[in-house]
Amino acid sequence: MGSRLHVQQIKNGPPLPYKDDIRAFTRDYAASLDAQDPLSHFREEFIIPSVKDLKRKTLDPSEGEYSSMYLDARCIYLCGNSLGLQPRNTKKYINYYLRTWAIKGVTGHFTHHDDELLPPFVDVDSAGAKLMAPVVGALESEVAVMGSLTTNLHLLMASFYRPTTERYKIIIEGKAFPSDHYAVESQIKHHNLQPKDAMVLIEPQDPEHPILETDRILRVIDEHASTTALLLLSAIQYYTGQYFNIEKITAHAQSKGIVVGWDCAHAAGNVDLKLHDWNVDFAAWCNYKYLNSGPGGMAGIFVHEKHGEVKAGQGDGELELFRPRLSGWWGGDKATRFLMDNHFVPQSGAAGYQLSNPSVLDMNAVVASLELFNRTSMAEIRQKSLNLTGYLEHLLLASLDGVSDKPFSIITPPNPSERGAQLSLRLAPGLLDSVLETLEEYAVVIDERKPDVIRVAPAPLYNTYEEVWQFCQIFSEACRKALEKKD
């Protein structure tokens, strides 16, 4: 998309004080925005790698071959959409857990301590759900911290994808994250159906403009409504950074009798979700991106309360009624869990979808981060994110003014309400490797998607306006060098 058109389409966002201010292009101005930032204190709650750390060849903290002040400076980490940084209190939480395990052994499952950070092992999942609920806009009973993202998608589809001879299709976006694609494809095959018949891919009208307009999504839903069992979309598209209109799409699909699920991997902790109010049937997400719970950390699920009810049997010997699912003992009613009578009665809500005893080690890492989110609100985090990513966009677009041989374009929607923290930059052909080399030289951490896209995601809890300004200076230099090499 051309920079002029992109600027014209920027709308519906917060006031941008820097839009018409020439001072916005100075480092001092960026620093002044940081000075006014009500969330700035959260930055010190995270461990931000130094330039020296990134260049280390060992993990030995005594390694001292790098000594310049520059190398001791913090890197510019704009990759929270891939892996969030470690909160400082993660170590404290995990050490408390290790201490409990060491001195209590199995009795740690039920023993309370006066100075505990979390309840006994047997109840840690409840602590995680309590802190997670406000982050995704859910009732506490509607969320569970469990498993991993793709595993959870399979578990949820086992419950919510109930194909019939009339309704058997699953609609997903054409460029869904590969693991989602694999999961949907394998679920279809599991039911002895063929993906070519039962898998509907929503593709953009123009491959050069990979945004899926809401109207296009609704048209595809209408086209396949009578034969579709499930709609499963990403809340935020991992490649473009597009934030879909969850409320509108969900209501439209449900009005056609379609069950609706959302992969919120790039949305949880990023945008102000309202999964309960939007009447979403189910959702799943990982917690290691914007929610900073560590590589492969424990994930989360949402099951709307209307699907989580457990009804008592109507008479003697009648079994309880609940939504079919793949069951495990940790999802069972806590009052009867340890009776070992082989009669499964699930907990109500999302907790009833749990299978095994959760990893208390992983749960501590999740809670350590969620505790920070619960010190503020997703509305406040989202407000800063809109401002921070808006500033990034403003500086990037300004760098293209008057440039005939444009080194990049922004493929993320210009409307701030249609994106999260991430901007996806499509580089001109042949520039990617050189640009990445320069960014690495200056200790800028972003990620790439071959063949020509880099994703830049300022995380509002630990990134600053000054870092955004620095990135834009370095990125402009990287593009200049890449163009010179190309010539």
Swiss-Prot record:
<feature type="binding site">
    <location>
        <position position="329"/>
    </location>
    <ligand>
        <name>pyridoxal 5'-phosphate</name>
    </ligand>
</feature>
<feature type="modified residue" description="N6-(pyridoxal phosphate)lysine">
    <location>
        <position position="289"/>
    </location>
</feature>
<comment type="function">
    <text>Catalyzes the cleavage of L-kynurenine (L-Kyn) and L-3-hydroxykynurenine (L-3OHKyn) into anthranilic acid (AA) and 3-hydroxyanthranilic acid (3-OHAA), respectively.</text>
</comment>
<feature type="binding site">
    <location>
        <position position="150"/>
    </location>
    <ligand>
        <name>pyridoxal 5'-phosphate</name>
    </ligand>
</feature>
<dbReference type="InterPro" id="IPR015421">
    <property type="entry name" value="PyrdxlP-dep_Trfase_major"/>
</dbReference>
<comment type="pathway">
    <text>Amino-acid degradation; L-kynurenine degradation; L-alanine and anthranilate from L-kynurenine: step 1/1.</text>
</comment>
<feature type="binding site">
    <location>
        <position position="149"/>
    </location>
    <ligand>
        <name>pyridoxal 5'-phosphate</name>
    </ligand>
</feature>
<dbReference type="InterPro" id="IPR015422">
    <property type="entry name" value="PyrdxlP-dep_Trfase_small"/>
</dbReference>
<keyword id="KW-0378">Hydrolase</keyword>
<dbReference type="GO" id="GO:0019441">
    <property type="term" value="P:L-tryptophan catabolic process to kynurenine"/>
</dbReference>
<dbReference type="GO" id="GO:0019805">
    <property type="term" value="P:quinolinate biosynthetic process"/>
</dbReference>
<feature type="binding site">
    <location>
        <position position="234"/>
    </location>
    <ligand>
        <name>pyridoxal 5'-phosphate</name>
    </ligand>
</feature>
<dbReference type="GO" id="GO:0030170">
    <property type="term" value="F:pyridoxal phosphate binding"/>
</dbReference>
<dbReference type="GO" id="GO:0030429">
    <property type="term" value="F:kynureninase activity"/>
</dbReference>
<feature type="binding site">
    <location>
        <begin position="177"/>
        <end position="180"/>
    </location>
    <ligand>
        <name>pyridoxal 5'-phosphate</name>
    </ligand>
</feature>
<comment type="similarity">
    <text>Belongs to the kynureninase family.</text>
</comment>
<dbReference type="GO" id="GO:0005737">
    <property type="term" value="C:cytoplasm"/>
</dbReference>
<dbReference type="InterPro" id="IPR015424">
    <property type="entry name" value="PyrdxlP-dep_Trfase"/>
</dbReference>
<protein>
    <recommendedName>
        <fullName>Kynureninase 1</fullName>
        <ecNumber>3.7.1.3</ecNumber>
    </recommendedName>
</protein>
<dbReference type="Pfam" id="PF22580">
    <property type="entry name" value="KYNU_C"/>
</dbReference>
<dbReference type="GO" id="GO:0034354">
    <property type="term" value="P:'de novo' NAD biosynthetic process from L-tryptophan"/>
</dbReference>
<feature type="binding site">
    <location>
        <position position="266"/>
    </location>
    <ligand>
        <name>pyridoxal 5'-phosphate</name>
    </ligand>
</feature>
<comment type="pathway">
    <text>Cofactor biosynthesis; NAD(+) biosynthesis; quinolinate from L-kynurenine: step 2/3.</text>
</comment>
<keyword id="KW-0663">Pyridoxal phosphate</keyword>
<feature type="binding site">
    <location>
        <position position="263"/>
    </location>
    <ligand>
        <name>pyridoxal 5'-phosphate</name>
    </ligand>
</feature>
<dbReference type="InterPro" id="IPR010111">
    <property type="entry name" value="Kynureninase"/>
</dbReference>
<dbReference type="GO" id="GO:0097053">
    <property type="term" value="P:L-kynurenine catabolic process"/>
</dbReference>
<dbReference type="GO" id="GO:0043420">
    <property type="term" value="P:anthranilate metabolic process"/>
</dbReference>
<feature type="binding site">
    <location>
        <position position="357"/>
    </location>
    <ligand>
        <name>pyridoxal 5'-phosphate</name>
    </ligand>
</feature>
<feature type="binding site">
    <location>
        <position position="288"/>
    </location>
    <ligand>
        <name>pyridoxal 5'-phosphate</name>
    </ligand>
</feature>
<keyword id="KW-0662">Pyridine nucleotide biosynthesis</keyword>
<comment type="subunit">
    <text>Homodimer.</text>
</comment>
<keyword id="KW-0963">Cytoplasm</keyword>
